[in-house]
Amino acid sequence: MKDIVFYNSLTREKEVFKPINANEVGMYSCGPTVYNYAHIGNFRAYIFSDLLRRVLEDYGYNVKLVMNLTDVDDKTIKNSKENHISLNDYTKKYKEAFFEDIKTLGIKKATVNPAATDHIKEMINIIELLKKNGHTYESDGSVYFKISTFPQYGELANLDKQELLDGASGRVLNDEYDKENASDFVLWKAYTEDDGDVYWDSPFGKGRPGWHIECSAMSCKYLGKHFDIHTGGVDNKFPHHENEIAQNEAAFNEKFVNYWLHCEHLIVDGEKMSKSKGNFYTLRDLLDKGLSPEAIRYSLINSHYRKQLNFTIEGIKQSQSAIDRVNDLIFRLKDINNTESNEINENLLKELEVSNEKFSDSIYNDLNISEALGILFTLVKTVNTSFDSINVNTRDAILKFIERVNNIINCFNMGDTDKKSNNEDEDKINKLIEERTIAKKEKNYQKADEIRNQLLSMGIEIMDTPQGVKWKRK
C-alpha cells in the first residue's frame, strides 16, 4: 500500500508518516478561543484538521483527535468583564456556537474537546516539573519559562539562534507576540484586579495559567507525553507551538510530537480580513447570504492547505456549481436499471480503477486535494459522456468511488436528504408534482409553471424524464 507523506513543519521536509502505534494515530488540533464566534479563517484550520483526519481514516487508521477549547485567556477575561458576565457564562455561549458551526460545516466532532478551565491541576503539575528541572523563575508573582535553558528553542519557527541569545534577557506577559519579541514567556500569571473573579490558588500564588501551558497539559493528559501529529494555523507556529514544544520536552525530557502540520492564512477578496473593510465573515454571516454550508466547506477545502487561500463570494458560488454537477450525476446514476454488459462499461470500469489509484496517490501525497478533485471531475465528465450505456454494475462501482471521495470531502449529497437544511414534507412535494402533472395533461401550462416555481422556492428541483417526473433537493 502506498505510504502517506506529510510536510513536517519542524524539519521543513516531506516525510513518510509512521505512527507510534501501528493502527492508531494520536492527533492534537488547536481549537477555538471561545471569546466570540469563530470566523471563516478559523474554520479553514478546523476543516484542514478534519480533512487530515478523514484521509488517515481512509488509509485505515483509527484516529484519536483532541481539540481543545481555550476558555480562559486575556481575550476571554477582557470580553466577559466588558459584558458584565461571569467567565463561565460568557464562554458557554461561544462553546455552544462552535459546536453548532462545526456540525453545520460537516466537521467531525473530536474524540475529546477538553476545556482549559477543567485542567488547571494538570497545568500546575507541569509548571512544578519545569521548576524542578530548572527551567523557570518567578517575577512579581508570575512564573516564566527561561528559554535560554532549552537549547532547541526556535527550531519549529526557524528563529535565528544568535539573535535569540542576544535578546533572551527579556520576558513577555502577553499570550500573543511576534518573532521579533521572542522572550521568556509566562507559564502562570499573578492575579491582578483586571482579572476580577478569575483566579486559582496554586503553589506559586493566586493567579491563572498562560495560554501555552494549557495545550501542553491537555495534549499530555489525553494523548500522552509523546504523540503523532499536532496541527494548527500557521499563525500558531510561533509563539504558541514553539512554546508548547519547550514546555513539554523540558518537563518530560522526551520528544513531544513527531509531525507538525500547519495550514496557511486565508485572505478575503485578496486582502486580510478586517471588519472595517467589510470582508470579515463568520459562518453565520455567510449562511445569512443564502450560501450553502456544503459550498462554504468546499471553498475552504479545495486548495492545498499549505497555500494561501483567497476566499470570495464568487468562489463559493463556483463551489456550489461544482457540487451540483456531482449531485446531479449521483441523482441520475441511481435511476439506472440497465443490466446489459458492453465494451463501454468494461472500459469505464478500467478507467474507474485508475481514477481510484490516482485519487489515493493525490490525497496520500501531503493532502493534495486540488489534484484529487481534478481526478473526480475528469471521471464525472467521462461518465456523463457515456451515460446512456452504463449498466447497474458500473453504476454501483461509480457510486462507490464517489462515496469514497465524499467520505473525505463531505460536500456531496449521496441521497441523505437529512443532510440538507430544507425539510419540507415529502407528501406535500409529491402532491404538488401530481397537481402539476394533471395541469399539464389539461394543457394548463401557466398553472404547471406556477407549481414548478413554488417547488423551486421550497428548494425542490423537478425533472421531466421518460420514466416520469423526478425531483431532488437543490
Swiss-Prot record:
Q: What is this protein called?
A: Cysteine--tRNA ligase
Which E.C. number(s) belong to this protein? 6.1.1.16
Keyword Ligase in annotation: yes
The note describing how and how many cofactors are bound reads: Binds 1 zinc ion per subunit.
Give the protein family: Belongs to the class-I aminoacyl-tRNA synthetase family.
Q: Which InterPro entries match?
A: Cys-tRNA-ligase, Cys-tRNA/MSH_ligase, CysS_C, Rossmann-like_a/b/a_fold, tRNA-synt_1_cat_dom, tRNAsynth_Ia_anticodon-bd
Q: Which Pfam families match?
A: CysS_C, tRNA-synt_1e
Chief place where the protein resides:
cytoplasm
The record ties this protein, via SUPFAM superfamilies, to: Anticodon-binding domain of a subclass of class I aminoacyl-tRNA synthetases, Nucleotidylyl transferase
User: Where, subcellularly, is it found?
Assistant: Cytoplasm
TM segments?
none
Kindly state the positions of the motif 'KMSKS' region in this protein: 272-276
Cofactor names from the entry are: Zn(2+)
Subunit comment: Monomer.
Q: Which UniProt keywords apply?
A: Aminoacyl-tRNA synthetase, ATP-binding, Cytoplasm, Ligase, Metal-binding, Nucleotide-binding, Protein biosynthesis, Zinc
Q: Which cysteines are joined by disulfide bonds?
A: none
Q: Which GO terms describe its biological process?
A: cysteinyl-tRNA aminoacylation
Q: Which PANTHER family does this entry report, sorted A to Z?
A: CYSTEINE--TRNA LIGASE, CYTOPLASMIC (PTHR10890:SF3), CYSTEINYL-TRNA SYNTHETASE (PTHR10890)
Reaction catalysed by this chain? tRNA(Cys) + L-cysteine + ATP = L-cysteinyl-tRNA(Cys) + AMP + diphosphate
Sites binding Zn(2+) sit at 30, 215, 240, 244
GO cellular component terms attached to this protein's record: cytosol
Question: Which parts of the sequence bind ATP?
Answer: 275
Where's the motif 'HIGH' region? 32-42
Which GO molecular function entries does the Swiss-Prot or TrEMBL record give?
Answer: ATP binding; cysteine-tRNA ligase activity; zinc ion binding
